[in-house]
Amino acid sequence: MREKSRLKILICLLTFVGFLAQGEARTVNVAVPTLNMVVIAFTVAKEKGYYREEGLEVEIIWMSAPVAAQALIGGNVEFSTVSGAALPAILRGAPLRFLFTTYNRPMFWLYAKPEISDIKGLRGKKVAVSGIGSGPAHLLIEILKKYGLEGGRDVALLGLGVQPNQYAALLSGSVDAAMMAPPYNVMLKEAGFYELVSFLKEDFVELQGSMIIRQELLRSDPALVERFVRGTLKGFRYARENRSGTIPILVRYQKLREELAAKYYDLVRPIMTLDGTASEELQKKFLDFGTVRLGLKESPPLQRVFDYSLTRRINGQLEAAGWKPEK
């Protein structure tokens, strides 16, 4: 117990000293594709003050997946959570790394107008995705292949940006189907739209809610990265272990009814990673999927894409200190 107490004090002191050294809170910009449960580790960390404890003022900026990837590469944001767009960039040579991951399955559902009751009914139709080349777009292309359809030829893919745009397009009838994430899938179900595919049930790996960073920042300011990872891990642990405390945060961020937020939480909680990392098996599966979709001959070594060492180290520190999220 004494050792744990000492470690708790040490972690607090290091955080405090780092904060004093900065003089004021350091602003950090994070690109996210949506403000839903996908980025819950980050929104909880902000709401519960875990980033402030690290001397960080975190700005969560909503942008489409392709724009988020370019913003990260260009240095306009320090971190991104958009794995589906970041992976192709890495495979094409962008110096980015995955440091942390919230989910290991794709949190997407393919919803269609009520009159379309199977995937083959999408032939000649229009389907909304966040962006051409995004993770959801490629998941859609793969599922269409299983039913003998080719995305872009038999089924038109329209990149409409963020989830509310896609949701509105399906409601208005300007598209026939859309790749939806919670809570929009639940809302569409309540409105009578038809669920064609739940990607939670398909054999795909999608490392959603990840933390992606430029290698240059990892080298030039490792202290900043460590503080951000620590704050995020605390947010992740809170969200994973505290259902009753997380649901109100979903309600505030997404202006949801409490009942809908609870359904949403319960739907995706089972696919959260255990500790913010992905096993090598899952890393390889995710990487191989990206390699195939880009038409590359072989996948690069895992270490060129993933580096969970800092997340594991900070997890160990929190465990040793006996840190638990408040109830």
Where are these regions (language model features)?
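Pocket-lining segment of extracytoplasmic ligand-binding domains
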Residues: 84-86, 164-254
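Bacterial N-terminal signal peptides
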Residues: 10-19
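Sec/Tat signal peptide C-region and signal peptidase I cleavage site
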Residues: 19-25
